[in-house]
């Protein structure tokens, strides 16, 4: 959407991932790639930073040199590197998005170097985790169930409102928890 809002309908997009063995990062990348299927954007070969923001910045700077229209970082280190590379480039044409939540990422969003970051909901994760532990300690069968605790999208607007835009999944997880 951010690309379309800038009138960019095609171009190359870089991906900076942690590594090729961290399951959550692999899934994040797969979802990102899936979102671009059937579009005119070319997703470049993923580069790995091992979670190191400085290495991620170098990777992102190389993508920028190649002329990408956007870059995605799959974790805090990768996202920080992406934002710092966009900042260093001086360009306001490159769209940067990330994953995870930190004061550094919030600053990069507020300063306009990242459009947004997807943040897990640690309070919800902790709350539901403790509830599951209590059930298990009481001998209840958890059935191997996976609980989606949702994700929140942090944008310049939501940060200015000192709030968070919840996805439907996060709202559904809250509703399910209230019913319990």
Predicted regions and their residues:
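Short beta-strand elements at the ligand-binding edges of bilobed clamshell
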Residues: 1, 46, 111-123
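Hydrophobic alpha-helical segments within soluble ligand-binding/sensing domains
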Residues: 1-10, 56-57, 101-105, 120-138
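Structural recognition of the beta-strand scaffold that forms the well-ordered cores
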Residues: 11-16, 45-46, 70-73, 95-99, ...
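Hinge/cleft segment of the Venus flytrap/periplasmic-binding protein
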Residues: 12, 16-20, 24, 35, ...
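Short beta-strand elements in bilobed, periplasmic/extracellular small-molecule ligand-binding domains
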Residues: 12-17, 33-53
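Solvent-exposed, acidic/flexible segments
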Residues: 21-25, 49, 53, 71-75, ...
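Short, solvent-exposed amphipathic alpha-helices that sit
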Residues: 23-42, 81, 85, 125
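Hydrophobic alpha-helical
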Residues: 32, 50-108
